[in-house]
Amino acid sequence: MSKQSTSHLFMIEPEAFYSNEQTAFTNHYQEKVTDETPEIIAEKALAEFHALKNAIEERGIKVTSLKGSKDCPDHIFPNWFITFDDKTMQIFSMMAPNRRKEKKPSMIEHLTNTYELTDDMSYLEDKEVFLESTSSMVFDRVNRIVYAGISPRT
């Protein structure tokens, strides 16, 4: 496996999935679907989640998954934390109030059973300073470089 690849993924199983009005203005790819009910959209998201999880596992990659929350429409994109090979992790500040809710104590506890929390930048939210992990940064782990997009989330 490439040094840029991983052998272990963390996925959030969608409890809900809908356009997030709090983040839409900073996400070019997010669009509001009006021709399907929220229930149908959630069913499709859940089916896609299971198909993707199965495809990943069939290729020998370990998947750890936890259930999302109905009040967190973007929960399936867990941009609030990152883990590293040395078993450490960091928690990031999130711009949207409903994205901050994704940092469920139960999920943090689950992660800290395996990873040492070395930095929690949540305190920056009160100062309106945001750094949303993979929603605004791309990590080149081999060359130890981070590429960041110009965004209110970075």
Each model region followed by its residue ranges:
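The feature marks the mature, well-folded catalytic cores of soluble enzymes
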Residues: M1-T154
